[in-house]
């Protein structure tokens, strides 16, 4: 398949949707994902890798551009046609993305699965192969997709359909000596979870009680709203079954892709990346959800930290764990560096290539490194030990992650922590001042976690740009079951 040159490698990026850092087979005794486990064993894991925003669309935009949301302008999940938006815009217009740069450098670029960055009716710039979900979530059978510009309901189980189309791309490029870039964007393990997945995946978990996931009292910030997350909080086992089964289905897809690369002799010249757009909590911290699973929006570790594994036989060490802090904004320059392609000049770029770390030429243990996150009016700065969160309108937070890894004790109001808090507040302020485009910034705008309906570059009013302001996001909490089946 395509390039056999390890110095101009093929690039395969597998991106899941809402996969918490705890939801990896080598960290979770309940999860069955042997193929992904082989990637971990055969590659290098960056185990403190952080999304740029703990929600789908802005996180994905940062992966593709190397910019933070305040510089690319995507600040909430994009509502799209599923929520009444017709004639969707392109949210990345005028921005340079990874596939665009690679295509210019001679790569064949393919996309299979979730896009969620505005219109997906036709291929985004840089792509020649395109199979795209029409929205950002929804059912796994009969899923809305675009096929050759026509809206269709996919008759196949969606996770397998995404794999099928990725396999078709690899097979179609088998006689092509150009290197490829293929992003396989699964919607799993995103909701809905119950009665969505074939028995061949759910039966793996027959009798499972999923004790690896906590049953905590609901957090006071948890958003009790009708739907999958509130159902999961009241009775978690059926939803946990779907969440875990969906990842086992992803694992089956990863197995098919790796087997095809092996069969065609391209595995040694293909760098495989496995990661997720943002994290997720399945009962952790007393919520089901990610950054918008609470009001105020949260920056807890399970929301902002995601799995990240790179496997490239012969170039990147097997079985190694790098615990340096790494940002999702680093993926864009790292992939270009791997391809031997110059990273375009961008004064607002927030990422840097971590290829030297992946090759073992540098370590990631610099205690001075800080990673940043943002979601509308909520921003985070995190060092190896401390996490500081500031909100335009809401509580300030400071956590000592060494002594309080579960983020239970907010020390922002302690006199003894004032120096640390003020130091991180200054670092955060100065950093965002350098990585910010005023016309794309939303710190002072009403981002509520209910979605974005228009790109900021259109210059429309807040009411025309964002779904309804947060308002009262807490309904009455129903009774919560802590039961586990016998």
Language-model-detected regions and their locations in the chain:
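Polar, surface-exposed loop/tail segments
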Residues: 33-34, 63, 114, 123, ...
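Short, solvent-exposed turn/loop segments enriched in Gly/Ser/Thr/Pro and often Arg
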Residues: 25-32, 44-67, 75, 111-122, ...
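Active-site beta-strand termini and strand-to-loop segments that position acidic
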Residues: 312, 381-384, 391, 401
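Active-site-proximal cap/lid insertion segments
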Residues: 3-9, 16-31, 54, 134-161, ...
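Active-site segment of extracytoplasmic enzymes that catalyze sulfate/phosphate-ester chemistry
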Residues: 13-16, 20-110, 129, 135-136, ...
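Short, structured coil segments at secondary-structure junctions
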Residues: 125-126, 167, 384
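Non-transmembrane alpha-helical segments in soluble domains
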Residues: 12, 16, 36-41, 64, ...
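Intrinsically disordered, low-complexity polar regions and short flexible loop motifs
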Residues: 404
């Amino acid at each position: 398949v395509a390039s056999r040159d390890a110095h101009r490698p093929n690039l395969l990026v597998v991106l899941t949707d809402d996969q918490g850092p705890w939801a990896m087979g080598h960290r979770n005794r309940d999860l069955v994902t042997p193929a992904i486990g082989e990637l971990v064993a055969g590659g290098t894991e960056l185990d403190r890798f952080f999304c740029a925003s703990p929600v789908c669309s802005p996180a994905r935009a940062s992966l593709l551009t190397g910019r933070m949301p305040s510089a690319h302008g995507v600040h909430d999940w994009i509502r799209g046609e599923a929520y009444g938006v017709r004639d969707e815009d392109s949210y990345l217009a005028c921005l340079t993305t990874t596939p665009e740069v690679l295509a210019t450098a001679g790569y064949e670029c393919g996309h299979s699965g979730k896009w969620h960055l505005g219109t997906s009716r036709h291929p985004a710039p840089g792509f020649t192969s395109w199979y795209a979900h029409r929205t950002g979530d929804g059912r796994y059978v009969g899923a809305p997709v675009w096929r050759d510009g026509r809206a269709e309901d996919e008759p196949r189980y969606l996770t397998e359909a995404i794999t099928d189309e990725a396999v078709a791309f690899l097979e179609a490029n088998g006689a092509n000596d150009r290197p490829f870039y293929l992003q396989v964007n699964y919607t799993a393990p995103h909701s809905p979870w119950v009665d969505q997945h074939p028995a061949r995946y759910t039966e793996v978990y027959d009798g499972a009680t999923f004790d690896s996931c906590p049953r905590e009292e609901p957090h006071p910030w948890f958003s009790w709203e009708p739907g999958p997350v509130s159902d999961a909080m009241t009775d978690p086992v059926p939803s946990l079954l779907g969440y875990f089964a969906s990842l086992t289905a992803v694992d089956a897809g990863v197995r098919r892709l790796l087997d095809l690369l092996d069969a065609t002799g391209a595995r040694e010249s293909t760098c495989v990346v496995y990661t997720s757009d943002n994290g997720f909590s399945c009962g952790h911290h007393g919520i089901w959800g990610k950054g918008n699973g609470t009001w105020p929006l949260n920056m807890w570790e399970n929301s902002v930290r995601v799995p990240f594994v790179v496997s490239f036989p012969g170039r990147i060490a097997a079985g190694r764990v790098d615990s340096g802090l790494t940002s999702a904004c680093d993926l864009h320059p790292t992939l270009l560096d791997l391809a031997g392609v110059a990273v375009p000049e961008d004064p607002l770029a927030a990422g840097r290539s971590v290829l030297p770390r992946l090759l073992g030429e540098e370590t990631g243990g610099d205690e001075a490194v800080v990673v940043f996150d943002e979601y509308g009016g909520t921003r985070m700065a995190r060092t190896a030990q401390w996490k500081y969160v500031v909100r335009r309108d809401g509580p300030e937070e400071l956590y000592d992650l060494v002594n309080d890894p579960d983020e239970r004790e907010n020390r922002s109001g302690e006199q003894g922590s004032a120096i640390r808090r003020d130091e991180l507040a200054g670092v955060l302020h100065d950093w965002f001042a350098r990585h910010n485009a005023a016309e794309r910034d939303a710190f002072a705008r009403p981002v509520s976690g209910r979605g974005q309906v228009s790109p900021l570059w259109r210059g429309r009013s807040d009411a025309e740009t964002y779904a309804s302001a947060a308002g009262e996001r807490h309904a009455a909490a129903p009774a919560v079951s802590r039961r586990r089946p016998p």
